C-alpha cells in the first residue's frame, strides 16, 4: 500500500527502515479510539463547511463498517500497514473511494496519535476505576459483616495486638481509595484534546477545536500545539 509520508524521496524505503518505524504491532489496539477520533474530526469538518454533508455521511458509514468488521473478526489488522492510521484510511478509501481521502483534512498523524493515546488511556482509566469501585464495595461488605470478628495483628511476623477483620480489611480499603483518587487525578490532567495541533504548529483550515473536544468528551483543547504532539506523559 502507499505510504502516508515520504513525498521528498524518489526511492522506496528500505524494508529494515520501514519495519523499524512501523508501529502497527502495538498501536493496532487503538483501532476503536482511532475511528472514534476520526468520526469526531469529520463531524467538525462538515460543521465548518470543509466537507459536505454527503461526504460526512459517506465517511462515517465507512468508518462504522470498518469498526464492525474488525470487532467481528471479518477484517484483520495486519503488518501490511505501517500503523493503525494507515490501516483505517486505506480500508476507508477501498470502501467509499475518493471521499475517504478527505478524512485526514486538517489533521496530521502527529496530533492523531496523540489523540488515540489519550482516548485509550482514558478508556483504560475508566475501566480500571470501575473495577476498583466494585472491589471497594466488596471490601465494604466484608468490613460491615466482620466488625466483631477478631484476629491477631502481626508485626515482624509475630503476633502483636488483637484487631478485627473489619479493621484489617479496612487498611486495604483505604489503599484502594487512594488508588481511585490517583486515577481521577491522572484523568483530569490528561483530559484535553490535541486535535488541531497538526504536525506541530496547527493548520490554516478553519477548525473548531472546542467542538471536536466537546464531541470526544474532553474538558477542552490543548493550549500549545508543540506540547500537544510531543506530550507522552
Per-region residue spans from a language model:
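A helix-coil-helix interface module used to build multimeric assemblies
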Residues: 1-202, 206-215, 219-220
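Acidic, glycine-rich loop-and-beta core segments that form the ion-binding/anion-interacting portion
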Residues: 216-233
